[in-house]
Amino acid sequence: MLARFLSSLLKASVTALAVVVAFGFAANFARAERLKNLATFQGVRDNPLVGYGLVVGLDNTGDQTMQTPFTTQSLTNMLSQLGITLPAGKNMQLKNVAAVMVTATLPAFAQPGSQLDIVVSSMGNAKSLRGGTLLMTPLKGADGQVYAIAQGNMLVGGAGASANGSKVQVNQLAVGRIANGAIVERAVAAFQPDGGVLNLELKDTDFGTAERVVEAINRSMGGGVAAALDGRVVQVRAPQSPSARVGFLARIENLDVTPAKAAAKVILNARTGSIVMNQAVTVEDCAVAHGNLSVVINTQPVISQPAPFSGGQTVVAPVSQIDMKQQGGSLQIVKAGASLAAVVKGLNALGATPADLQTILEAMRAAGALRAELEII
């Protein structure tokens, strides 16, 4: 009996130890990612394009041409290029034309004949671009060269209606998209590595991640292929032959690399009140007291009616009432937390709104209780 008891006790101890070890490994395990999600090759990038054009065929929802002279001027110039001359001083009061800006992104290695998606945005006072057709619009790059030509029927995701001063609108009506609405006419200069040397640029600067990238490349491709220049750029020696280089870079992009643990950071959005923090954020024990101050202003119109036949005038005078309330905040303890769940639990215990929580986090950072970098966007 004693031997059987000791045997079962030993098995239970080994099982418990295995569970603890497995849990420890799971807690410290960082998920590996493909290198293409962590870095990009310098020189392989998209290029923005922009153009100015006209949208026609709108159902009385276009620009009010008397208030947008650039629309009238653009329409006159376009008609003159088509051989149509308008009388001098003629004011065109049109409602089915709108001046727009057209934007697109030219991807790397795009060749003439490739098609691009474009976004069309109203720049005047058009009510809606629904049902409109974009006329041929050249799209230029930062160097002023035309790289694509855009034209086509737009798709507007919003909807709206108005009558007798009432208006209902869903989503944005002044912006539309045209799938495959532009055709590439000029290719960007091809990417040529200098002496077979490529620079791999990390999306986030981190010396630890850069070192791991170098180790992964050299382990897979051979020693001396990669070397880190700093915490963001890794230099890679690629084959001289273009065909061999493509396969070489494809293998590098699909290497699995475990990134280093990110620095603790808290992002505060002052416009929306949003707060985002990563898993590395920790807090120390601290005491927090925060009181809210609210000011409410109510304005009521008061009508002053003069006596009959007095010759006075009826006057509407606004009367304002101002109420100021301050809520006292008791001193509360925020316990130290080494995990994100513990940090969230401790901050939620304060019962503060997101706007108040931003101020509290700034004060905690100044007091040294918040172990994270604050970034306000």
Curated annotation (Swiss-Prot):
The keyword Transcription does not apply. Assembles around the rod to form the L-ring and probably protects the motor/basal body from shearing forces during rotation. Keywords: Bacterial flagellum, Periplasm, Signal. Pfam families: FlgI. The basal body constitutes a major portion of the flagellar organelle and consists of four rings (L,P,S, and M) mounted on a central rod. Residues 1-30 form the signal peptide. Its main location: periplasm. One of its GO terms (cellular component) is bacterial-type flagellum basal body, distal rod, P ring. This is Flagellar P-ring protein. The keyword Signal applies.
